Regions:
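Phosphate/ribose-recognition catalytic cores of enzymes acting on nucleotide-derived substrates
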Residues: 100-155
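Glycine-rich, Lys/Arg-enriched anion-binding loops that position phosphate/diphosphate groups
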Residues: 1-4, 17, 24-109, 113-114, ...
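Proline-aspartate-enriched helix->loop->beta-strand connector
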Residues: 8-19
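Active-site flanking residues adjacent to catalytic metal/cofactor-binding acidic residues
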Residues: 21-23, 148
Length: 155
């Protein structure tokens, strides 16, 4: 967060645009909130999360994945889709959705889950039931590489 204010404050450009990717959804929301709260004249442009052909969220970190680790990393998006499908079939309890996602991720050896969270898509507040748009966010270490991914449900 300090980086964007350090860049903006000394320059004071007349029009300042900044692109932040939706892949790190939490960071994007926090930066948008900071820009609003501090009344910076900055337009934040959300960069769409782009997936590679195999479903892995595009990231420079993917270059560190061996072919074996890349195969394992596919479970992140599969697990997000599983959570979304369960939601679309009527499940609204966050605890059940998270358990299904974790179980799916744990089915692949060599994937160390750091977190699986489902939060309000606008505020990132903790929720017990999904009643409006929410973000499913996951982070895991595959091999030596930390990967993050997310998907929005309820839109």
């Amino acid at each position: 967060m300090r980086g964007i204010s350090n860049l903006h404050l000394p320059l004071r450009p007349p029009q300042f645009l900044a692109v932040f990717g939706e892949k790190d959804y939490q960071q994007l929301l926090l930066i948008e909130k900071m820009v609003e709260d501090l009344n910076f004249d900055i337009e934040i442009i959300p960069g769409t999360l782009v997936r590679e052909e195999d479903g892995i969220a595009m990231s420079s970190r993917n270059a560190y994945l061996s072919s074996e680790d890349r195969e394992k990393a596919k479970v992140l998006y599969r697990s997000l889709r599983k959570g979304k499908e369960l939601f679309e079939s009527g499940e609204r309890r966050v605890s059940i959705l998270i358990k299904a996602i974790r179980d799916n991720m744990e089915s692949v050896n060599g994937v160390l889950i750091q977190y699986v969270e489902i939060k309000d898509a606008e505020t990132l507040a903790r929720i017990e039931n999904v009643s409006k748009p929410a973000v499913i966010a996951i982070a895991a270490i595959v091999g030596l590489t930390r990967l993050i991914d997310n998907i929005i449900i309820g839109r």
